[in-house]
């Protein structure tokens, strides 16, 4: 289900990217560790990379997680470490973790700044997408609305 959720979010974002001013790519690979001789170890794969198409070329790391998330107490430290590392590797100042919505309404969660980067505005956001719709079209429209809120 993890991969299916990731693909659904990515394909929906890709479909509506012309409305956002961002270009979305999936499974962008970069090495986490490289020796002085150029030997690569531990490649990383970003679920979705959003890059602004004009201006400052801002990058946003998007990581999808198909697991229960009803509030800030439900996040995993490992997930935040993961997107924080991606932000460092790709020189991004914004990461978004996207989960399916479990309750009847989305949790109200503010953006969090990495403790040592408050002045640099490096932040992590937690978003949910309601997948409990009558049709795939309705679910895609929900993702589209989320995309508009994030990127506009």
Regions found by a protein language model. Give the residues of each.
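Catalytic core segments in nucleotide and nucleic-acid processing enzymes
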Residues: 1-152
